[in-house]
Amino acid sequence: MTDSKPNFQKAYINANEILVSSKIITNFPYSATKLIKEQSSIVCRSFDKAHKYNVDIEAFGSDSAVIMNLDDKYIIFYNQNEMPERIKFSMLHEFGHKVNNHKFIVTSDEVYGIAEVETNYFAAQLLMPEQILREFQKRGRRIDKYFLMTIFGVSEQAAIKRIENLNQITWERSQ
């Protein structure tokens, strides 16, 4: 990743390709673990199981989740003590690093920040697809954080951020 800003279009397209190809996603919310398993060879394990792989999770600086390449096998380790909604987002975020072809050895804070924003957008699109939200709006539904939390099974933080991003997207597309 050498771009100077997040490639939202790439993240959007990659998420949409998964949304339309998945047989797991028949309604919302869905199982992130099952989706990752269906779409890749990535294995998901809790932080509690990291020691079985001789992995020190604390060395990676994430309290929620991390993706690692161990002997050419990708594993997403997640914090089982988080809320289920947070775990789901974190797992799909880490999955997004692989899908969006991010480097796992980051050369700078700027590159890391760009990758993080891009994968947050990817995870949000998988969990709360823009197309579905726009259709709800066309049908008169008010899209607020409570609606997103209830229908899509996401955390309050993810719902608020998605609404902010959707408002930004609407403004940018009208330019």
Question: Predicted segment positions?
Answer:
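Active-site hotspot residues in diverse enzymes, especially metal/ion-binding acidic/histidine motifs
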Residues: 1-175
